[in-house]
Amino acid sequence: MAQIKYYATGRRKTSVAKVWLSPGNGKIIVNDKNMEEYFPLETLRIIVKQPLTLTETLGKYDVIAKVKGGGLSGQAGAVRHGIARALVLADPTLRPVLKKAGFLTRDPRMVERKKYGLKKARRAPQFSKR
């Protein structure tokens, strides 16, 4: 019999993560690497594991994620979003818990565009009175 896999997409900033969740023993693989290899910082690993830790399903599912775009922080957020969405597909009773924690909401914060006449989005050129 084919193994059940739950697929979900997660997004954060400019990163997009495709996440497959299947019953297993808790392996998390990101872009064909172990999560520990791919995310060098402990804070990023914690972010990725948050939905599993909150729902107490850390050792019950294997996660395979393919993530593109953005930096490591955005990618970690995208994987977290994808895992949370996939968990809801796997077990709809987890939805209220994940919703309350805010893991099912796409974080709308994006980089503000640079404006002409300014150095960055808000940074004005240095002003000299004399």
UniProtKB/Swiss-Prot annotation:
<dbReference type="InterPro" id="IPR020568">
    <property type="entry name" value="Ribosomal_Su5_D2-typ_SF"/>
</dbReference>
<dbReference type="GO" id="GO:0003723">
    <property type="term" value="F:RNA binding"/>
</dbReference>
<dbReference type="GO" id="GO:0022627">
    <property type="term" value="C:cytosolic small ribosomal subunit"/>
</dbReference>
<dbReference type="GO" id="GO:0006412">
    <property type="term" value="P:translation"/>
</dbReference>
<comment type="similarity">
    <text>Belongs to the universal ribosomal protein uS9 family.</text>
</comment>
<keyword id="KW-0687">Ribonucleoprotein</keyword>
<protein>
    <recommendedName>
        <fullName>Small ribosomal subunit protein uS9</fullName>
    </recommendedName>
</protein>
<dbReference type="InterPro" id="IPR020574">
    <property type="entry name" value="Ribosomal_uS9_CS"/>
</dbReference>
<dbReference type="InterPro" id="IPR000754">
    <property type="entry name" value="Ribosomal_uS9"/>
</dbReference>
<dbReference type="InterPro" id="IPR014721">
    <property type="entry name" value="Ribsml_uS5_D2-typ_fold_subgr"/>
</dbReference>
<dbReference type="GO" id="GO:0003735">
    <property type="term" value="F:structural constituent of ribosome"/>
</dbReference>
<keyword id="KW-0689">Ribosomal protein</keyword>
<dbReference type="InterPro" id="IPR023035">
    <property type="entry name" value="Ribosomal_uS9_bac/plastid"/>
</dbReference>
<dbReference type="Pfam" id="PF00380">
    <property type="entry name" value="Ribosomal_S9"/>
</dbReference>
